[in-house]
Amino acid sequence: MTGFGQRLDAAVSARGPLCPGIDPHPELLNAWGLTVDAEGLRAFCDICVAAFAGFAIVKPQVAFFEAYGSAGFAVLEDTIAALRAEGVLVLADAKRGDIGSTMAAYAAAWAGDSPLAADAVTASPYLGFGSLRPLLDTAVANGRGVFVLAATSNPEGVGLQRAVAGDVTVAQSIVDAVAQANREADPAARDGDPVGPFGVVVGATVADPPDLHMLGGPVLVPGVGAQGGRPEALGGLGNARRLLPAVSREVLRAGPAVDDVRAAAERLRDQVAYLA
């Protein structure tokens, strides 16, 4: 089994590091002339799949699918399958986090053998990093990845993430825990991955980001474009093994034409190509 890190490394080398997002805001559905329901959601996603077929990895924002109940989850399942059929890795932005058997159930859904299981999933560590163990173990066993929230760009996160625990910030302690998890990952399951299966999320506009030099895994960097992150400034995040700039609104507002969405994404991919 080829691990997530190895698949990601190959995909980024061939297709660049940009991670376009599928964020079907109701406002975007309206702007694209689509109905704000599951039918409009499906049409929106079909356009995105066609536009992003040549990219390494794509990030659907799960909340916008959940809003439509079971019909929305059906669209998400089909979108994940369609992207993977195009050879695109899928990062489900679900931000799951819980404890014990509940975390194990989330792990089965998003990193096990489930129609919702993507190549990787985002997770929240703020019930304690150890609470993520069922998800980390399930991901490695199935050749999938996990991106753990570390330093987000929303102002509400500053008080918690920049709090000092011992002699490091909470955000740095999360990065360090993920680095340790990468070192401990089963070598047989990793199959010689040049990049570990576990990454972190660090916002593009975060001031004084955590030190990523020892992470040994990928870094998802949301907030590029409309949210203020500058593509040319991302190299300052440090010697991370793989930076994945994530962009949604900056690209999606070019729609609804497939060619226009693709062209907007390709322009940004060219701007961050120096990271690959």
From Swiss-Prot:
EC class: lyase
Disulfide bonds: none
InterPro entries: Aldolase_TIM, OMPdecase_AS, OMPdecase_type-2, OMPdeCOase_dom, RibuloseP-bd_barrel
UniProt-recorded Gene Ontology molecular function terms: orotidine-5'-phosphate decarboxylase activity
Reactions mediated catalytically: orotidine 5'-phosphate + H(+) = UMP + CO2
Domain of life per record: Bacteria
EC annotation from Swiss-Prot or TrEMBL: 4.1.1.23
Pathways per UniProt: Pyrimidine metabolism; UMP biosynthesis via de novo pathway; UMP from orotate: step 2/2
Keyword Lyase tagged: yes
GO biological process: 'de novo' pyrimidine nucleobase biosynthetic process; 'de novo' UMP biosynthetic process
Active-site residue numbers: 95 (proton donor)
Keywords from the UniProt entry: Decarboxylase, Lyase, Pyrimidine biosynthesis
Family membership noted in the UniProt record: Belongs to the OMP decarboxylase family. Type 2 subfamily.
Protein name: Orotidine 5'-phosphate decarboxylase
Taxonomic placement: Bacteria, Bacillati, Actinomycetota, Actinomycetes, Mycobacteriales
